[in-house]
Amino acid sequence: MKKTILLLILLTGMIFHGYGRERIDGGVNDYKNSIKLTFLSWISGSTKLSYERALPQARQSSELCASWIGAGRDKYQNDPKGFTVRYGHKFFFRDHDEKSLQGWYLRPEAIYSYYNYDCNSSGNKELADMGALLGTAGYQLVYNRFLADFWIGAGYAFGHPSETKYHHGFELWHWLGKTNDHLAMSFSIRLGLCFCIFLTLHHAIIQHLPT
C-alpha cells in the first residue's frame, strides 16, 4: 500500500512539474508562480502580500494582492483598520529570453480599499471606502528564484475618500496645490520568490510519509 501511494505521488509530481516549471534556452528554470511582499508597505500602515501565476502558452499573468490595513507603522497617526484587495492582469512584451514572469509589461488593475480611521478634522471615526480602475506599466526582474517588480500607474477612482487621500494601494491626487478625488496614482516595488507549487507540495508530502 505504501509503495502504491509513493508511486501515485511521484506520477503526480512528474505530471505537474512541467506545468509549474519549464526550462528555456541555456537550461535556466522558468518558474510559473511567485509570491511577493510590497516593499516598504509596512511603513505606510499596511502589509501587502501578492500571488502571481503565469498563464500557459502566453506572455501574460494573473496577479492577486491582499492588504491588511493596520498591520504596519501608523504613518498618519489615524489608527486605520481594514483591507485592500486588487487584481491585475499583466501583458508582457517579448524579450530575449522570454522567462514567463520577466520583462516589461502593461497591467490593467481593479482595486478596492475599505478601512476605518480617526478623522483629525472631525474627531470621529470615519469610513474610507474607495475603488479604482488603473493602468500600470512596469518591469519585473527574475534572478534564479528571486523576483523584483517595479511599476507606476494612474486611473479613475470612485467612492468615499479619506482625508489623507491615501488608500493603501493607491493615492488620490493632492499635489501642486490641487486635489482630485477621481484621479488615482499608484507606484511601488514588490520583492518575492518564484516557485513551482505542485513540486513543492509533492516534496512536502514525501517528507511526511511514515518510514
Give the positions of each predicted feature.
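Short loop/turn motifs that connect adjacent beta-strands in outer-membrane beta-barrel proteins
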Residues: 21-31, 56-59, 94-103, 142-148, ...
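Sec-dependent N-terminal signal peptides
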Residues: 4-14
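Outer-membrane beta-barrel "beta-signal"
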Residues: 86, 181-205, 210-211
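Outer-membrane beta-barrel pore domains and translocons
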Residues: 40-42, 65-69, 109-113, 153-159, ...
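Residues that define the transmembrane beta-barrel architecture of outer-membrane proteins
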Residues: 29-33, 43-47, 79-85, 102, ...
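Gram-negative (and chloroplast) outer-membrane scaffold detector with strong preference
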Residues: 53-146
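Residue-level signature of outer-membrane beta-barrel architecture
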Residues: 41, 53, 91-93, 139-141, ...
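Membrane-embedded beta-strands of outer-membrane beta-barrel proteins
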Residues: 49, 87, 135-137, 152, ...
